Amino acid sequence: MIPGGGSSLVHAIKAIEKYVETAPKTNGHAATWADEKIGIDIIRKALEEPLRQIAFNAGFEGSVEVNNVKSKKAPHGFDAMTGEIVDMFKAGIVEPFKVTRSALQNAASIGALILTTETLIADKPEPKKDAPAMPGGGMGGYDMM
């Protein structure tokens, strides 16, 4: 079990930032690092999104709560019921590690597939039709006397 509510993902950003600090910046091509940096920024934002959405759904400012969790050490996270930063294990807000790992692996796999595919095909959304008008008021002769 790992801390739930997206807090584990937010705390994982610290490892990504450590990688950014220590990674070679050129690999022989300056453009390569620029492309990698864009990918890293996308992953960083994606890892924040579950917590941001949970906070928003609970009526809080998501970005503020993400920063609050970032400033704490694991296993602290955002408790949407109380609006406080708590020890997620003590609060009982946990999730299975395997589920989170599988979600991240599947997302990475799909991302890699999109990057290596030359063409993507998607359905064009059909315009939504207005609902039919409601029938007129009561039927003649059936009203109350």
What does each of the following model-derived ranges do?
Residues 1-145:
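Extended, low-charge hydrophobic alpha-helical regions
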